[in-house]
């Protein structure tokens, strides 16, 4: 109740809203966490059988090795006028894990990473229209899919996702398709001058009938930039992107959540000829 008086909705993240789980009974705030345990403000201890930090803490809360390294880095200094050498080291490691990629950019959140990737891909393809399959954040470009039909994102985000404030001029720039429905995607490409295909590699169901391979070939044949959003799927079943397991490479891939094990970091990796379009548009952020 106190939070709702000062924070719209009561929480910063929709998925952490206690009303989604058990209204008036679900503990909304924590005092500390360790491994798979969370302590609330009253000192009660819970075993987290839910999201483990919305899927971020794949190694458990406050992993001792990771926290030791984080604390050491913090003690060496905070943000300065100069750049951090860790950016280069992590970028090189991500490229090493994904040999098809050559360049990397970092962001703080998945929503921001998706917006950066879309900007780069639109610049590279020279086309505005995007076909999407999955959950890709909260920014205007994505939510515009619901303009004119409030049910377009039902299978990807939530039923009748509210989009007030999203410019109506973005209508008919983003089109959704269902996972494993290749014919639906093909029709979008044929009818709407699609320049970018953005999708999750896999979520609740596995790809069937070489779905990912067909998407890759379609993108290559039509000069479309293919983006795999692996904010959710990356660094779980494989050490890197889940696309490695399926042996299908995108032009751009996005990683988050498990990448930082509870610390805010996201990465956009991609082919050099695509990623260099960063230099043709303004993409910059202090943090």
Residue ranges of model-derived segments:
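Conserved N-terminal phosphate-binding loop of PLP-dependent enzymes in the Aspartate aminotransferase
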Residues: 1-287
């Amino acid at each position: 109740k106190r939070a709702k008086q000062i924070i719209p909705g009561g929480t910063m993240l929709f998925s952490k809203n206690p009303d989604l789980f058990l209204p008036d009974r679900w503990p909304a705030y924590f005092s500390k966490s360790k491994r798979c345990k969370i302590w609330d403000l009253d000192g009660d201890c819970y075993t987290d059988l839910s999201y483990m930090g919305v899927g971020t803490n794949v190694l458990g809360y406050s992993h001792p090795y990771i926290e030791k390294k984080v604390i050491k880095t913090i003690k060496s200094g905070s943000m300065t006028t100069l750049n951090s050498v860790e950016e280069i080291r992590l970028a090189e490691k991500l490229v090493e894990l994904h040999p098809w990629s050559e360049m990397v950019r970092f962001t703080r959140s998945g929503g921001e990473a998706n917006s950066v990737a879309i900007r780069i891909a639109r610049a590279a393809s020279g086309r505005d229209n995007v076909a999407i399959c999955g959950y890709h954040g909260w920014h205007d470009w994505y939510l515009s899919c619901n303009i004119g039909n409030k049910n377009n994102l039902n299978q990807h985000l939530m039923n009748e996702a509210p989009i007030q404030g999203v410019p109506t001029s973005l209508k008919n720039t983003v089109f959704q398709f269902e996972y494993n429905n290749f014919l639906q995607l093909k029709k979008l490409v044929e009818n709407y001058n699609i320049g970018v295909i953005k999708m999750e590699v896999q979520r609740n169901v596995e790809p069937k009938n070489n779905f990912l391979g067909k998407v890759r070939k379609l993108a290559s044949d039509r000069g479309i930039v293919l983006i795999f959003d692996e904010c959710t799927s990356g660094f779980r079943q494989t050490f890197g992107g889940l696309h490695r397991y399926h042996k299908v490479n995108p032009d751009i891939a996005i990683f988050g959540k498990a990448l930082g094990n509870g610390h805010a970091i996201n990465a956009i990796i991609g082919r050099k000829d695509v990623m260099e379009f960063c230099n043709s548009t303004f993409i910059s952020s202090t943090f």
